[in-house]
């Protein structure tokens, strides 16, 4: 999901070159971190417009944290690739519809507006470059007029990236940064017909990857490996959605192998993949635009579960990717100690021993060293990444890595 003249050309060329730098492979190991989302559960003060704030929670819906606390409308959170920061949209003061792009840390500190867009224009729906060196965003004007822009992570060097033939929403780079996916409004008048497009990073090769006439095909998001796209649509394909409700779908990145994952009388929208191999999809589901909960299911549409059920509306979930050391074994968790996703590597480092070390570390008060293992920790907004290492007698490095949810 979403000014140019001669003096700025050097900066523009530099930014474009940075956008094409190689990125880490999508298969790099990551943990599934926290889920950030917008929520309208907090009532605005008397006389203020109804607005939302950004929260985060653990993948099971526990350990809820409120990350923004202001009377303006904070929406469309997007985690940085390293899981340390969140870009989001913040409504301009005294405006019901116009937004600016902003960012904050994973813990909800260091709030900073990145754009200052002259009225009646708006800058919204920021999404990180996969190499963390910039942000795409939607720049819009009166009505539906809009285009794809890019800027640095501090808001520097804003520039037009791509001007599509139709109004645009929810732009984002593929993991290898070779393509941009986005929603295009294709209805002759108003916003009643949307389609999903991809375009090459250089602005060529515009391709329609999903378009059902008269349907609302929107909110595309890349899978971690870039092979698939999840999206929302109210299309009635093969009479599988006769009521025309918004449902969650997936497809190959070229538009083939289209699959409808949800099928119910609710509005299912705004999907996001779990970072660790894209095995799950999180999304919003509710009876109408004023009510909705964050749900999670497998990437095949099974084992659906509601996270944080409550009255009101939660929307636009995005799943934090926490970098993880490469390991040979995935060992589960230690639920009694708030430890999950234990991973092990090294000679003699079997899962039983890895979980035992994690348990002992937690019971010992989470020290910097335990049983000869050096311990490094990093807090990422309430979830702590823990890495334990030491050299064995054979010189090979033994390693235990996991997430600690006790914070």
What are these regions (language model features)?
Residues 325-360:
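Extracytoplasmic/periplasm-facing segments of secreted or lipoprotein envelope proteins
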Residues 345, 353-407:
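Extracytosolic low-complexity repeat regions of secreted or lipid-anchored proteins
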Residues 267-286, 348-371:
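Short, positively charged, low-complexity/disordered linker segments
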Residues 26-325:
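Sequence signature of WD/YWTD-type beta-propeller architectures
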Residues 23-33, 377-382:
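Short, surface-exposed loop and linker segments with low hydrophobicity and enrichment for Pro/Ser/Thr
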Residues 92, 139, 285, 333-338, ...:
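Short acidic, glycine-rich loop/turn motifs
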